Structure formats: structure tokens, C-alpha cells
Amino acid sequence: MLEFYGKRFESRLLLGTAQYPSPSILADAVRASLSRIVTVSLRRESGEARAGQDFWALIKALGVAVLPNTAGCHTPREAITTAHMAREVFGTNWIKLEVIGDTDTLQPDPFGLVEAARILCDEGFEVFPYMNDDLIVAERLIEAGCKVLMPWGAPIGSGRGLNNPYALKTMRAHFPDIPLVVDAGIGVPSHAAAAMELGFDAVLINTAVAKAGDPAAMARAFALAVEAGRLAYEADPIEARDMASPSTPLLGKAFL
């Protein structure tokens, strides 16, 4: 069972709530995904007062845990301010911390991220940092107080999948007891399954579901892929080989 900061969840799929064609389609996708955690941007929630209230009512009606994020923040100060606002609005100490360093790739700023994480952890937040796949950055975030890490698979919204599976596999081996979530870049369910097969605890999906032709069907596909990938990891899959290895025994086989 998935566990973040002492809270346990049956689903290992986290779902973002942005970019859906309509609120009803979002609700259908969340239900189809079986996800028990959704991410919410404070900027989206706070747009128009009535629209924000309707959106928040929809999320509460779904009965899911809310993970607010600091999407769009480019400095530690901006991210920290947004985190405090999110805690007031959503009534949770959880925060998905994003400090963007590059506007083209939306790559996280590792220095600003660690700085903001340290301050927020000291202030009682339970931080989910969106990061690259660098082990040293991961070490610093853990030292800052983070008990979850969210390395990217590829740039946000790119749909490229796992750009560097070697780095992700190394991170899993290096931090066997830290919950790891692949966040960003997942495009199709097979990408999610691959992440789970590496031993990651969960994946976070947004664009791949929200922008699909049928978001609810795609959400269900991702739910199945995540489950399949986790089962495969727990089943201890065989190692890849360079040479063939016969699967059919030769004993009793006729030789002509």
C-alpha cells in the first residue's frame, strides 16, 4: 500500500486536475483512475471566485486527498508564499513544491528547490518536491526534511516517457526506503508501467489524461498500467540477457 507522511492509499496513481475539457470530464477521469490523490494548483483555484468555489466543491465531492502545488513559481520566495496560501485555502500541510528554473523545459531549479524545501519543512509543511533525477539534489532534499521525492521522467507535458531510466533505477537503488514518484513527462500507459517496474512507488499523470481523446478511458488505462507495473516489480522479473536461453526443455525431444 502506498504511504506518504503517515497516510496510506490503495491506488499508486496520482492525478493532476488541470487542462480538462470540462469539470464533468475531470470528475469522470478521477473516478475511472481510482486515484485517491489529486494535485491542485492554487493559481487555478483562485482565478475567478465563483469558478474556484465550484471547482473546490467538485474536488470535495470526489472524496480524494488534495495535494496543492506551487506550479508557475520561479523563486523560493514565490513558492513559499504560494505554499502558505495553499495551506490556508486547502487546509493541508501537504505541498507539491515546484521551483522552475527554465521556462522552455520547465526544468526545476535545484538550488531554489532545496532552499524552499528546507524552509517549508521547518515551518511544518510535508513537502513533495518536483525535482530532476540528480542523486545529490535528492540527498539535499532529504537532509532538508523531505520524506518523498518526485523526480521527473521527462519535461512537463512532453509525453516523452522516461528519458533516463538508468538514473531513475539508480535513484531507486540509492533510496530504498524513500517513497519515489515519477512526476512529469509520462505520455502513455506503457511509460507508467515502466516506471513502476523500476520499483517506483507511484506516478503522477496530468496532461496524458487531460488531453486524451477520451480522458476517462485513458485514466482507466493508466490505472491498469500502474497496477500491472507494480505487480511485475513485486514478482521479481527476470534479468535481460544478451544471448538466447531456451525455454523449452530438450529432454524427451525427438531428434530427426
From Swiss-Prot:
SUPFAM superfamilies tied to this protein: ThiG-like (SSF110399)
GO CC terms of this entry: cytoplasm
Active-site positions on this chain: 96 (schiff-base intermediate with dxp)
Gene3D superfamilies recorded: Aldolase class I
Highest taxon of the lineage: Bacteria
Reactions the enzyme catalyzes: [ThiS sulfur-carrier protein]-C-terminal-Gly-aminoethanethioate + 2-iminoacetate + 1-deoxy-D-xylulose 5-phosphate = [ThiS sulfur-carrier protein]-C-terminal Gly-Gly + 2-[(2R,5Z)-2-carboxy-4-methylthiazol-5(2H)-ylidene]ethyl phosphate + 2 H2O + H(+)
Chief location of this protein within or outside the cell: cytoplasm
Name this polypeptide is given: Thiazole synthase
Organism encoding this protein: Brucella abortus (strain 2308)
Gene this chain is encoded by: thiG
